[in-house]
Amino acid sequence: MSAFTPASEVLLRHSDDFEQSRILFAGDLQDDLPARLDTAASRAHTQQFHHWQVLSRQMGDNARFSLVATADDVADCDTLIYYWPKNKPEAQFQLMNLLSLLPVGTDIFVVGENRSGVRSAEQMLADYAPLNKVDSARRCGLYFGRLEKQPVFDADKFWGEYSVDGLTVKTLPGVFSRDGLDVGSQLLLSTLTPHTKGKVLDVGCGAGVLSVAFARHSPKIRLTLCDVSAPAVEASRATLAANGVEGEVFASNVFSEVKGRFDMIISNPPFHDGMQTSLDAAQTLIRGAVRHLNSGGELRIVANAFLPYPDVLDETFGFHEVIAQTGRFKVYRAIMTRQAKKG
């Protein structure tokens, strides 16, 4: 991270106002402004592991990663700068959590791109910190208010649940496919062979639906799941537990925390990071898979048909197959052979 997002550029127009402030940065932290802005003190809280990785290198323990912020995470802060995400329920979860911890009188700034729906912050916070728009630039809005009343926050009330073919899927705000199984994952699931054995890694696991569906037909697989999102990690753990499926689940920026090799890697990789389109995660997944597959192991991913993954697959593995497709999605399969580049 070096270039600033439009939201951060709007904040920089007001940088003089923050020099004496003890700031908590939270929300969709897409750059390292929290580490670079001139303030009296800065902390950051994020639910995204890859954002925490960047910020913690510069901020140390003042950058925190977790699903729910605690009193220690906001200690001594007199100002909140919240970057609005594209997902309104995610904003609700995070803001109610943070405002329940910050003292009355805290200055509240909310910034975000207009297309993300940042305007709805006014209505969301009306009972706690009435907001006024104080700047508009770079297709972003900046809102300011002061905390007048702490909300009551109960994380348990944000859990959702749905069923897929008799399986229970637990979800939280900010988790991909929160309201039901997406078409791409359905297509990938249709290609999985029953009675598969071996070690399976589910990268970008979301709510864990791919893993539990796979395990139902292949109970002898040994599952490992990872995601950059704290809500996804917690949702996957809950989904596994709800279906009596065992597996290890942890936060990881693609393979950053993954150890060892697997017989199969499955993924429905993201191509958005917040409001921005990003193919980085999927390309890192494909290129890094060769370091985490056993000989003869396979990578199986589903992706929008228009995304340019065949070239990366061929470059990395020497070849690929399309084993299922619709008008919108393709399921790609690549096998770890001697042709594959060993990372």
From Swiss-Prot:
Chief place of localization: cytoplasm
Reaction(s) catalysed (UniProt annotation): guanosine(1207) in 16S rRNA + S-adenosyl-L-methionine = N(2)-methylguanosine(1207) in 16S rRNA + S-adenosyl-L-homocysteine + H(+)
InterPro entries found in the cross-reference section: DNA_methylase_N6_adenine_CS, Mtase_sm_N, rRNA_ssu_MeTfrase_C, RsmC/RlmG, SAM-dependent_MTases_sf, Small_mtfrase_dom
Keyword terms of this UniProt record: Cytoplasm, Methyltransferase, rRNA processing, S-adenosyl-L-methionine, Transferase
GO terms of molecular function: 16S rRNA (guanine(1207)-N(2))-methyltransferase activity; nucleic acid binding
Job description of the protein: Specifically methylates the guanine in position 1207 of 16S rRNA in the 30S particle.
The protein's name in its UniProt record: Ribosomal RNA small subunit methyltransferase C
